[in-house]
Amino acid sequence: MEKCQRCIIICAGDLEISQIPLKEDDLVVAVDGGYMYCRVLEITPDVIIGDFDSLEEPYASEVRELEAARVAEPGESDVSCTSENREAAEVECSRVIRLEREKDDTDTMAAIRYGMQAGCREFHLYAAMGGRLEHTIANLQTLLFLKKNGAKGYLWDAFSMTTVICNESISFRESMEGILSVFAMGGDAKGVTETGLKYQLQDALLENSFPKGISNEFIGEEATVSVKDGSLLILARWE
């Protein structure tokens, strides 16, 4: 497998956008019910991963057809397409990895691990929020997992971007309009500074048990958030 630059993961939560921006060398992973979004948006995923408990018909049948139309490659646990049976499937040929329903990793985390093994260090997750609350929380924790393992992760929906920073800074262009919320994650965050926003912070402490950094506002200046010691969950919501 060639080393990828970005991994685009399409999950099974709420998707309120009509287009997902892709680059030619992106690794695109459909997670369980996220395969339905791929079909609707006419995206061909490189791999489909999941136990498929959230994938409804007719898409569940399509995945089964994809599995039936493939033979396992020697030494691999997943399945791939052969030239003889490529036309047997009604959908584009992708790799299918069916997971056990009882497992430690969520389907999304399995997709993250797949992307990291492929060499990706930048992850963009769509339809990763909404739906079941526990999966939204798990996906927010996944952002911290990525950061602590040398990668960057972003959750996107129609009106927001969510990411995590650790002992570093993040900036937003001066044309940004909307709301910026900042939360301590995984423990207290020390030395938090926010500039270029309506409410300024300088070398502050954000406690993991109190939402002090919610609903700041962009004011037409370049905005920067930094933390000296700890991790911050950053949520930018635009208008």
Question: Where is each model-derived feature located?
Answer:
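N-terminal beta-strand-loop-alpha-helix module at the start
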Residues: 1-62
